[in-house]
């Protein structure tokens, strides 16, 4: 949890106590490399294919707003043999693009029609939690938030486009 909840120790919310606890665990002999491999290098082939598909085909970049979003439809999820957890972390990937401050993912619920799950990630002082509250019936932390919408994917995309263009903090 310490590794994933801190974004691999990259989030601004990291506190010195976490690093003290990690140093104590290392002193006790934990195998940090094995833990890392089990957490981050343990994906299925279908998850990797999904990641490539999303970044190549589904990613919409708004360079002038330092933002990006992508969609995952039920059809996409079925095609890539989606299993719970396969979408975890995908929303962080667009933040690797130079200059990006905000990334949003829209994922159709696999069972409930017209239910869209929204994940938001940001860097620096961009308050994605405020955007989640204002536009996506959600909330969360400064740089990691979520929400949901009861609408079609087309309607959700229109709302994301509006949010990216209008939101000011």
Where are these regions (language model features)?
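His-Asp-centered metal-binding catalytic motifs of divalent-metal-dependent phosphohydrolases/nucleases
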Residues: 1-7
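Hydrophobic helix-and-loop "lid/oligomerization" segment in the mid-to-C-terminal part
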Residues: 7-135, 140-169
């Amino acid at each position: 949890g310490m590794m994933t909840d801190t974004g691999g120790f990259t989030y601004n919310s990291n506190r010195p106590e976490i690093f003290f606890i990690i140093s104590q665990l290392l002193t006790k002999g934990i195998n940090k490399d094995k833990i890392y491999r089990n957490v981050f290098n343990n994906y299925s082939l279908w998850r990797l294919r999904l990641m490539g598909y999303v970044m190549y085909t589904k990613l919409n970049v708004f360079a002038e707003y330092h933002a990006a979003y992508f969609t995952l439809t039920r059809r996409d999820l079925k095609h890539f043999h989606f299993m719970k957890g396969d979408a975890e972390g995908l929303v962080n990937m667009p933040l690797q693009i130079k200059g990006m401050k905000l990334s949003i993912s829209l994922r159709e619920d696999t069972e409930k029609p017209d239910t869209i799950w929204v994940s938001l990630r940001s860097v620096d002082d961009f308050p994605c939690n405020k955007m989640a509250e204002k536009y996506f019936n959600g909330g969360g932390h400064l740089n990691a938030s979520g929400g949901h919408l009861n609408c079609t994917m087309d309607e959700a995309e229109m709302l994301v486009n509006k949010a990216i263009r209008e939101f000011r903090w």
